[in-house]
Structures are given as C-alpha cells and as structure tokens.
C-alpha cells in the first residue's frame, strides 16, 4: 500500500522518520523536509517501515551520491546527504543520548572534528565470493542488510589506489587454485606500504604463491595469510613482517602495527582527535595520567610527551607489549608503564591499587566502560582524577557511563561533541570531558531532578 509522508528527521540507519497519528514510520530513501510517496513494507504494533518510490518535494540537503554502488552496497548509507547535514544528524544523536539515557544536557557543544569526506578509510574488511551464475569473483563490501557481496569495481571511501585494486584483486583471486575457498581480504594501509590479509580455507599452491608475489610487485602491497584462527596469521614473507606503521607527526612518533591490530580507520581524524584529547585534558608536566583501553599506545605515547608518567592499560598483552616496544623506540620508556587487565571487570579496589591519577583518558570499544565508571564513582572526592576525557564510538554507552560519572560519582560534564571518523555512515564517534569539583555543570533534565 502506497502512502504520502512528510519527513521530520533522519535516524542513524539513514531512514527518514515520519509520523502518522503518533506512530513512527521509518522511510528508506527519504531525507528530512522531503515529501515522498512510499510503499509500506513492514508493519509492527509500534512502528512501520516504508520504502520511497518517488520524491514529491526534494530536500535542499540531498546530493548526488558519488559511488555507482550506493543504495546497494552496505559500506555507506548517507552519500545522498550533504556532509554538513550528516554531521548535524550525528550531533543530534549524541545530544539525544545524553538527554534520554544520561538525563542531562550538554553544557558546551564542541565543534565537530572533520576531515576528508572521501578516500579516508585506511582499514577495511572486504568480502570475497565466487559467483558461478555471474561467472566471476566479487570483492567488496556486503550489500546492505544482506550476506551477498556487492558487485563493485570502485569505492570512493577507500584511498584511490586501494579502490583501483578492486578489479585486479578479482582477477587475482579468480586465477588461484582455491578461488572458491577465500572468504575475505583485510586491507591495512600504512605510510609506506599496504598489507592485504588473505583468509584462505585450503592451502595455497606454489603457483598461487607466485601469483601473489607478482601482484605484490605490481601494486606495492605485502601479503599476510590466515588459514584458520587468529593465531595462524603470518606474513607471506617474514622479512616484511614489520613494514606497517602510521605517523603522528605533531608528536614525532612512528607507530608500528600488524594488520590484525586495532588502529583507527581514519588517519586524518585520528591525528586531530589525539590533539583535541590532549588539549581537553590539559596535562601538566608534573601530572600522572591513566590511559584506559590504550591499545597500541595511540594516546599513551603522545601523552607521555607532556606528562610526568602515563600508565596505559589494555586487555591484550600482545598490544601492550607492542606499545612498550614503541615507547622504547622513542625513549619514552621511563615515562610510560603498561598493564594488561580486563577493564570490563574492574572495581574500586583495583583502581585504588594503581595509585592516584591526576587525569584520565578512556577510549573503550562499543561496549563502553561501565565497570570503570562504577569504580570511579566509588572513589572519594580526593581520590578522583580531576579531569576525564572519554572518547567513544557508541553514543548510547557513552551516555550510560556519563550518567554514572555525573549522578553517582559527582563529576560534571563540561563539554562533548562529535568526531566524524566515518563520513557517509551512521557511525557516531564522539568525545566528552568530565571534571571533578570544578567546571560548568551539565544541566540535568527534569527526569533526573
């Protein structure tokens, strides 16, 4: 059944939101302020889902998608929306999370951190599938809401030279003896070279290896192989094992990593984010700082250039070992210490055992830092870090943890804002600042009063 809708807003799945007698209608393919005709494709008691068939009144924020696969490929969902409007939607999602979950408003909204809208994705997991009906191998992202692989020959969010490899990769995989036993290729773009991690379910032949080597020479890539679980990951040639690194030039740091290590997808934004976090923390040279969920030391090492001591804590000993090596390479080993701990199961006694921290940076995965927030809330006022900067990749868990820090721990939210780490997607990265005992208080909503 087709109906006409006026779109009020957009959700993070890029669906326009309309209302009919108070019931939410999520309209795929529609943008705010548009009037569209759409088919209802699903009915639920509390909402309905519709798909746009025609646009009666078009939004001034609608733009022509750059990618020919947009609409089919699940890698991007907002290419049809002006980039400024994309950021505004993410900012609203952040503010809504604080209001509805944390029961507070943001007293000072930080200007959004933005970088290039295209060619920014330096990490990617590409699916591979041999499609007999099409007579070819597909290499790309999954189709939206599907397990099928998009039939794509270019990708504008990947660096251009990686996009240019999509068709040659198809041809390469199609030439291998196990062309139907390769489910994915992970891409990790470093400063000097690009690593391709090939997941293969059966052994490669000598001829296959020759093919990989020839591709490596033509495209300046290094191959890594994974035959089973994560512990089977290895470089095709051992002498290339240490070729990946990224630079943090404002701190004079070179950060080595492996293709399976977590690094930020967007190098441009990562540099801006580190600088912003350090500026907000305002660390003094006599202060002791904690960096929780420190990973490879992405924040730890820059912090060590200004602090008296930085303690980096992470759940993976592999990552903390690499962080320690990087600190030593930059003569920062005297100012850094690393510990391997499960930060999802910490308590206040654990926190006290680490000693007092003047400042703290928290950069958790999507699950957030619930246990850490609870532990901080139980500290006495004199034991607390005076300032916390929280970097988040999930506005819901950030808001949950913020509620604990503010309503139970006596902290004040002083500022928060979005970081557009993933343009053209619904992913919301953000940064928030909390202060103990001073600073502008977050304004509680009526529900929290």
Regions picked out by a protein language model, each given a short descriptive name:
Residues 6, 12, 203-449:
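Rossmann-like S-adenosyl-L-methionine
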Residues 1-69, 338:
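Terminal RNA-binding accessory module
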Residues 37-39, 125, 290:
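Hydrophobic beta-strand signal
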Residues 30, 39-43, 127-131, 188-190, ...:
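Short beta-strand micro-motifs enriched in acidic
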Residues 148-183, 189-193, 202-227:
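Internal alpha/beta scaffold segment
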Residues 18, 33, 76, 394, ...:
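Residue-level signal for inorganic ion chemistry
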Residues 53-65, 71-182:
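Extended interfacial segments that mediate partner engagement and assembly in macromolecular machines
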């Amino acid at each position: 059944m087709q109906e006409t809708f006026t779109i009020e807003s957009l959700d993070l799945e890029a669906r326009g939101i309309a209302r009919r007698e108070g019931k939410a209608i999520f309209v795929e393919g529609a943008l705010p302020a548009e009037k569209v005709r759409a088919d209802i494709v699903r009915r639920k008691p509390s909402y309905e889902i519709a798909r746009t068939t025609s646009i009666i009144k078009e939004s001034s924020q609608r733009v022509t998608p750059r990618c020919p696969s947009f609409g089919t490929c699940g890698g991007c969902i907002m290419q049809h929306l002006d980039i400024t409007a994309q950021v505004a939607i993410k900012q609203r999602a952040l503010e809504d999370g604080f209001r509805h979950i944390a029961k507070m408003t943001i007293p000072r909204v930080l200007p959004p951190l933005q970088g290039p809208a295209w060619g920014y994705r330096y990490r990617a997991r590409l699916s591979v599938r041999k499609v007999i009906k099409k007579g070819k191998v597909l290499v790309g992202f999954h189709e939206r809401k599907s397990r099928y692989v998009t039939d794509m020959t270019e990708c504008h969010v990947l660096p251009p030279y990686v996009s240019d490899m999509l068709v040659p990769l198809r041809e390469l995989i199609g030439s291998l003896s196990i062309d139907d036993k390769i489910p994915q290729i992970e891409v990790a773009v470093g400063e000097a070279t690009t690593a391709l991690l090939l997941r293969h379910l059966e052994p490669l032949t000598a001829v296959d290896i020759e093919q990989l080597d020839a591709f490596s020479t033509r495209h300046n890539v290094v191959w890594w192989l994974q035959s089973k679980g994560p512990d089977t990951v290895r470089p095709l040639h051992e002498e290339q094992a240490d070729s990946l690194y990224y630079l943090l030039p404002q701190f004079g740091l070179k950060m080595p990593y492996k293709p399976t290590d977590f690094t930020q997808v967007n190098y441009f934004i990562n540099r801006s984010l580190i600088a912003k976090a350090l500026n907000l923390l305002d660390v003094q040279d006599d202060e002791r700082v904690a960096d929780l969920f420190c990973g490879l030391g992405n924040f730890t090492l820059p912090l060590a250039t200004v602090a008296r001591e930085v303690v980096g804590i992470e759940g993976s000993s592999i990552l903390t070992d690499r962080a320690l090596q990087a600190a030593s390479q930059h003569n920062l080993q005297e100012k850094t210490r690393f510990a391997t701990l499960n930060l999802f199961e910490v308590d206040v006694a654990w926190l006290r055992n680490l000693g007092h921290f003047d400042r703290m940076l928290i950069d958790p995965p999507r699950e957030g830092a619930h246990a850490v927030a609870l532990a901080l809330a139980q500290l006495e006022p004199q034991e607390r870090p005076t300032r916390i900067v929280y970097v988040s990749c999930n506005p819901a868990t950030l808001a949950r943890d913020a509620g604990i820090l503010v309503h139970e721990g006596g902290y004040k939210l002083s500022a928060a804002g979005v970081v557009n780490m993933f343009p053209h997607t619904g992913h919301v990265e953000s940064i928030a600042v909390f202060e103990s005992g001073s600073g502008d208080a977050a304004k509680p909503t009526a529900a929290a009063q």
